[in-house]
C-alpha cells in the first residue's frame, strides 16, 4: 500500500487535496471513513478486494445523500482514498465488477466467485485461519455483504436474507458475530441519516416559507 501514514498525516493530505468547507452534518462520517481507511492502509496484510470495495462505494453514496454541491462527492471519496494510499481506481473497478455480478449471477455463484477472489487477494491463505487474529477484516466488508444481499434480485437469492448472509460470511471466513454487529450498526446509522435528511428538508422548507411571508 506504500509508506505508512498517521491519521494526522492523512487528514492533512485530505484537506490539501480537498480544500473546501465540509458541512458539519457530514464532517463526522467523513472523519470516520478517513480513520478507517488510514488504519487499514497501514496493515501489511490488508488487500483491496471486491466485497470491501463495494461496501466502501455503496456506503459512501448512502452517507453523502444530500451533500451540496453534489459535484464534490466523487472528489471527496477520491481525496479520502488518496490521503490513505488506497487505490481509488481499483476500488471503483472492483465495485463495478460486483454490480455486474449482481445483475448476471445467482447468489450462490456470486459467493463462490467472491470466496476465490478474496482468498487470492491474501496470497491463498484461507481467511478462516485468520478470522479475529488480524486486521484484515473491515466493517466495510460487512457492509459490502449486506448491500450485496439487499440489492440482488429476489429470484436469484435462493433463501432469506439472514440465511444468505450467514452462508456468505462463513464462506468468506469472517466472524459471524462481528459481521452481524457491524451490519446492525450500519443499518442503525442509515436510519439516523434518513431521519437527519428529513429534518434538514423540513428545515429548508420552513425557511423558504418564512422568507415568502416576509
UniProtKB/Swiss-Prot annotation:
On whether Protease is a keyword of this UniProt record, the answer is: no
Keyword terms, alphabetized: Coiled coil
Q: What's one GO BP annotation on this UniProt entry?
A: photosystem II assembly
Quick one: signal sequence residues?
none
Coiled-coil stretches noted in the UniProt entry, renumbered to this chain: 175-212
What Pfam family does this protein match (any one)? ThylakoidFormat
Q: Which InterPro entries match?
A: Thf1 (IPR017499)
Q: What highest taxon heads this organism's lineage? A: Bacteria
Give the record's family classification. Answer: Belongs to the THF1 family.
Sum up the protein's function in the record's words. Answer: May be involved in photosynthetic membrane biogenesis.
Q: Which NCBIfam families does the UniProt record give?
A: PS_II_psb29
Q: What is this protein called?
A: Protein Thf1
Q: What species was this sequence derived from?
A: Prochlorococcus marinus (strain SARG / CCMP1375 / SS120)
Amino acid at each position: 500500500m506504500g509508506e505508512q501514514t498517521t491519521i494526522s498525516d492523512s487528514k492533512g493530505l485530505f484537506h490539501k487535496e480537498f480544500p473546501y468547507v465540509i458541512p458539519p452534518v457530514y464532517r463526522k462520517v467523513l472523519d470516520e471513513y478517513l480513520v478507517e481507511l488510514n488504519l487499514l492502509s497501514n496493515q501489511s496484510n490488508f488487500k483491496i478486494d471486491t466485497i470491501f470495495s463495494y461496501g466502501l462505494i455503496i456506503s459512501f453514496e448512502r452517507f453523502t445523500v444530500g451533500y451540496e454541491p453534489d459535484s464534490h462527492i466523487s472528489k471527496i471519496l477520491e481525496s479520502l482514498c488518496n490521503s490513505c494510499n488506497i487505490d481509488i481506481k481499483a476500488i471503483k473497478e472492483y465495485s463495478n465488477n460486483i454490480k455486474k455480478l449482481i445483475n448476471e449471477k445467482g447468489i450462490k455463484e456470486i459467493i463462490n466467485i467472491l470466496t476465490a477472489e478474496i482468498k487470492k487477494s491474501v496470497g491463498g491463505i484461507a481467511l478462516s485461519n485468520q478470522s479475529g487474529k488480524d486486521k484484515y477484516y473491515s466493517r466495510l466488508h460487512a457492509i459490502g455483504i449486506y448491500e450485496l444481499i439487499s440489492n440482488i434480485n429476489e429470484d436469484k437469492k435462493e433463501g432469506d436474507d439472514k440465511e444468505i448472509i450467514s452462508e456468505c460470511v462463513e464462506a468468506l471466513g469472517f466472524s459471524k458475530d462481528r459481521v452481524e454487529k457491524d451490519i446492525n450498526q450500519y443499518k442503525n446509522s442509515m436510519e439516523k441519516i434518513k431521519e437527519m435528511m428529513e429534518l434538514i428538508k423540513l428545515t429548508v422548507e420552513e425557511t423558504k416559507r418564512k422568507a415568502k411571508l416576509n
